[in-house]
């Protein structure tokens, strides 16, 4: 069993004590959406107001921007549409924003949709037929396209035509409709879930990575300026450190800290104020929330640090296994607090230290 270091404050939100089953059922009220990386309907308009409008304003992803600048320049010289582009990586890193920027740089329109909305063939055919020369069609969660919609994209991407089958059996006929040259930009968090025929039709396949703290600090400072929120650089750094490497989360946390400063009648966001506000929101110094810490604490306390299976962790914490795997684990893996092995999940020494436990490598001590 892991031993809690007595030097830690037992009531600190950053180093919680062992979480009992009763405490798990009565978890503190927290807006879990703060650290979610998915877009929220009520914040989409606000997000649009702070999106960068061109590549020069887009912070981070240096390697990606260099590749895209070359692609844009070449397409303009040839007077052609951009090559089809597949963007993959964790949510909240700016895939939709990049599609809008590319449309602005090329001087064309960008139509945005998501694969779950394209349930019937006519949903995607309507979009394709109405595209003008050079337009961009952005499909989010493209790995979730159904087979029929995906197959309609094959000739559209390769030959700028739409093949529609009419009739059945021996009387079936294929009618080809010419399309304007266009660019398909697909976004996915699961590139491995794409079929090879679809993936191979993209001329450019680029990965978006998590942001560094200094990059997120620039994001926070830029957003604060747009929102007319006064903030010290140290305050921006504190928010950046707790933003899980994700701009969308950084902007969301900034707004909550801004509100906290407003209620407290404090003119400028300092490091101390940002830390105080985020501690009250249960977002700790590494960006972990209550559920992140619960998952790690459960693995350490109940299963001696692991290895333990995902379903077992889910049952022990009362959280959905898919939610743990897709929402919480990616960041825990990224910062080195969790290892995912064939035998199960293992909490690392860094996780022990962060939660205030003594790390015992050989946990099978009698």
From Swiss-Prot:
Region (Large ATPase domain (RuvB-L)): 13-211
Location in or out of the cell: Cytoplasm
Disulfide bonds: none
InterPro entries from the UniProt entry: AAA+_ATPase, AAA_lid_4, DNA_helicase_Holl-junc_RuvB, P-loop_NTPase, RuvB-like_N, RuvB_C, WH-like_DNA-bd_sf, WH_DNA-bd_sf
Gene Ontology annotations of biological process type: DNA recombination; DNA repair
Transmembrane segments: none
Location of region: Head domain (RuvB-H): 285-366
Statement: the UniProt record of this protein carries the keyword Membrane: no
Residues the record lists as binding ATP: 50-51, 92, 95-97, 201, 211, 248
Pfam families recorded: AAA_lid_4, RuvB_C, RuvB_N
Stretch list, region Small ATPAse domain (RuvB-S): 212-282
One cellular component term from this protein's GO annotations in UniProt: cytoplasm
Gene3D superfamilies referenced in this protein's UniProt entry, alphabetically: 1.10.8.60, P-loop containing nucleotide triphosphate hydrolases, Winged helix-like DNA-binding domain superfamily/Winged helix DNA-binding domain
Biased composition (Basic and acidic residues): 21-42
Catalytic activity, EC: 3.6.4.-
Molecular function as annotated in GO: ATP binding; ATP hydrolysis activity; four-way junction DNA binding; four-way junction helicase activity
Similarity comment text for this entry: Belongs to the RuvB family.
Subunit structure: Homohexamer. Forms an RuvA(8)-RuvB(12)-Holliday junction (HJ) complex. HJ DNA is sandwiched between 2 RuvA tetramers; dsDNA enters through RuvA and exits via RuvB. An RuvB hexamer assembles on each DNA strand where it exits the tetramer. Each RuvB hexamer is contacted by two RuvA subunits (via domain III) on 2 adjacent RuvB subunits; this complex drives branch migration. In the full resolvosome a probable DNA-RuvA(4)-RuvB(12)-RuvC(2) complex forms which resolves the HJ.
Recorded domain comment: Has 3 domains, the large (RuvB-L) and small ATPase (RuvB-S) domains and the C-terminal head (RuvB-H) domain. The head domain binds DNA, while the ATPase domains jointly bind ATP, ADP or are empty depending on the state of the subunit in the translocation cycle. During a single DNA translocation step the structure of each domain remains the same, but their relative positions change.
Function: The RuvA-RuvB-RuvC complex processes Holliday junction (HJ) DNA during genetic recombination and DNA repair, while the RuvA-RuvB complex plays an important role in the rescue of blocked DNA replication forks via replication fork reversal (RFR). RuvA specifically binds to HJ cruciform DNA, conferring on it an open structure. The RuvB hexamer acts as an ATP-dependent pump, pulling dsDNA into and through the RuvAB complex. RuvB forms 2 homohexamers on either side of HJ DNA bound by 1 or 2 RuvA tetramers; 4 subunits per hexamer contact DNA at a time.
Name by which UniProt lists this protein: Holliday junction branch migration complex subunit RuvB
Organism expressing this protein natively: Gloeothece citriformis (strain PCC 7424) (Cyanothece sp. (strain PCC 7424))
């Amino acid at each position: 069993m892991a031993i809690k270091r007595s030097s830690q404050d037992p009531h600190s939100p950053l180093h919680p004590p062992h979480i009992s089953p009763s405490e798990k059922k009565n978890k503190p009220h927290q807006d879990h959406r703060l650290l979610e990386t998915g877009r929220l309907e009520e914040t989409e308009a606000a997000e649009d107001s702070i999106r960068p409008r061109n590549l020069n304003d887009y912070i981070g992803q240096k390697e990606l921007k260099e590749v895209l600048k070359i692609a844009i320049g070449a397409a303009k010289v040839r007077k052609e549409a951009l090559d089809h582009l597949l963007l993959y990586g964790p949510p909240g890193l700016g895939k939709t924003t990049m599609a809008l920027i590319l449309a602005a740089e090329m001087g064309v329109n960008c139509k945005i949709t998501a694969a779950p909305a394209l349930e019937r063939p006519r949903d995607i055919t309507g979009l394709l037929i109405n595209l003008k020369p050079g337009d961009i069609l952005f499909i989010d969660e493209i790995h979730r396209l159904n087979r029929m919609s995906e197959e309609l994209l094959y000739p559209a991407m390769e030959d700028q035509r739409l093949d529609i089958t009419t009739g059945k059996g021996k009387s079936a006929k294929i009618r080809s409709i010419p399309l304007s040259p266009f660019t398909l930009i697909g976004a996915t968090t699961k590139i491995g879930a794409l079929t090879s025929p679809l993936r191979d039709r993209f001329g450019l396949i680029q990965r978006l990575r998590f942001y560094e703290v200094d990059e997120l600090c620039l994001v926070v400072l830029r957003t604060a300026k747009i929102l007319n929120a006064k903030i010290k650089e140290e305050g921006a750094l504190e928010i950046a450190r707790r933003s899980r490497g994700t701009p969308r989360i950084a902007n969301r946390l900034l707004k909550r800290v801004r509100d906290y400063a407003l209620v407290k009648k404090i003119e400028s966001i300092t490091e101390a104020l940002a830390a105080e506000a985020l501690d009250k929101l249960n977002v700790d110094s590494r960006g972990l929330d209550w559920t992140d810490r619960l998952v790690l604490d459960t693995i350490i306390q109940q299963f001696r640090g692991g290895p333990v299976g995902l379903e077992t962790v889910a049952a022990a914490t009362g959280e959905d296994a898919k939610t743990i795997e897709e929402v919480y684990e990616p960041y825990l893996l990224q910062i080195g607090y969790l290892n995912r092995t064939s035998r199960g999940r293992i909490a690392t020494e860094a996780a022990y230290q962060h939660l205030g436990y003594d790390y015992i490598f050989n946990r099978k001590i009698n």
